[in-house]
């Protein structure tokens, strides 16, 4: 009876303890500090994606076999009233419903309504410190809709029927007199509208006073179709100022009428240059289209000569643009205009233009704008995806920097490196979100963050690194990226403090991609995956999951731990050096280094180990060391005493606590290794069939029990060892001829060393 009870107890101990380790080997570990907040289950949990792939969006991250998106083609006219800052226009929108759903109404954006005194966006502008709204200007803002008609054509006869519509803040719902059928039906809607431009319109549009006349930078100027997609149907989030735009693709045909002394530049290609430029300007324009160097089309002297002249006549400028999501323009009598040829990888050409006042001229300022524009477009075209527009125009305005397809508005006072930075950034937006049409209103990091990331690469390339930035010290950025009051990057800009937008939408996502490229995937794998994402979703509407899935599938890595740490959560990183000990207390036999992950974020481990002779060895451990551990020990095959060990020596990870990153022989302790030779051997119990074998590897005592996987134990006292994972303790006698295996801190099973 006693023997049966003993065998049952031993079996129970093994079943409850050691069997929990089946199919996994526990690595060498040090005692886990109770202060660690790290949970490897949280970091590496399965099922990151809340839904499977669909017929429209593949689980691999590419558009599905049945992917669809709707289309909006625009015929637009605009007349500029310079005195009143008023734009009067018409828009004929051909909207094509490619969705599987029928429609009885459509939604449009009327974004100028942000500047209505009663708008929601105006109501939430703080008393001070905001870039949004009209900066306190009191004026009659907002779109004035004169009429909305549905246009039909039957046997050559055109009919216009008034449509019922309702305006709700910055959205307009138009009821269709006839239901729009699914999968290819279209409707033509004609809208007459006008509005007065704000002087400063949420830093995205405005009017700048210069000594030679006003500069009009015109955007969000016509009613634009909302996106109807497979994610949430109509996307009708209001324009509140902080979040930007989500728009359908289509072709544009635009006629802009302005005072005859104005130069007008636009997103598209000018198709009537002979009607608006004089013979000299036409000749210079032709030269610019074939020149790698900047060519003046309209000079500063010519601007000054015609400055502030009273003009009663007008010119109409005609522009066309294909497969774009928006169209913006600028107009002024104050514009100096210069240009140069853009060379694209396919052999096609585009045209770089710069329009700026004399106050901005000079080689230290906007005189280099076209050079910057050309370099930026050529770089991104070669590296990621070819530029798709016939013109790239940089306009000096009173915006800090704002992007539209083929045209950007940058600060008129910018110079040198600042001008390069804002020019390169705004033109980078022609890839994100102009070519890759993500939902800016919800996920600003998918355009601002991606763009800031590619800017870091182009700046390193430009003019042999003229404006190359130093490598980011991520230790210094760690607190900024992860402070407790910071929202997550997945938040909409409308759902975060305005002061946090720069961090969460620009710098943190950009930094995440830098870390992913340089420390996790490597440049080659990252660049292929990122380029594939651009190619797959060019002129389409990706979601965050489409990006995450593409990066994983092309790179061949499960990156859920990375997305969780950086994007979904606001997790901190704190890796630290735990203990150092020489194998058998002999520096010639190597050193065992133990590192610990103290906080929620998991990242790879990089250490520099410097020996007494001055030799430095770099050690890299993959992130998988944290996949089932809070603490990790490894052996470094050094042959002499260690002088210092530095964790993350390049400050390449956002480690929030540098205090535990450096160990030096002068200040740090070396843990004495327990000489394990006396414990090694095979142990038996004459009342049980199991044998227990103790072996040593790299200074770690390992335990093998018959028919059970090996595990390791750590010392917890004199001749006393424990495996917390197995739930077992081993108390050796002083002569080390045997031990008691302790189960549940109470039951003892004696074993004796075999002779």
Q: Where do the language-model regions lie?
A:
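Short, hydrophobic/aromatic-enriched beta-strand segments in well-ordered soluble domains
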Residues: 91-93, 97, 108-112, 185-199, ...
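Peripheral terminal and inter-domain segments
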Residues: 602, 609-616, 620-628, 645-651, ...
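A surface-exposed beta-strand-loop module
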Residues: 26-37, 86, 96, 102, ...
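Hydrophobic alpha-helical and helix-loop surface patches within well-folded domains
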Residues: 5, 23, 35, 39-52, ...
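Glycine/proline-rich low-complexity spacer/linker segments in large multi-domain proteins
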Residues: 118-136, 194-252, 273, 651-672
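Solvent-exposed beta-hairpin/edge-strand motifs
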Residues: 107-158, 259-262, 610-620
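Beta/coil-rich, acidic/histidine-enriched accessory regions frequently appended to metallopeptidases
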Residues: 83, 536-672, 692-693
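Hydrophobic helix-coil surface modules that form long, contiguous segments used
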Residues: 223-234, 240-424, 453
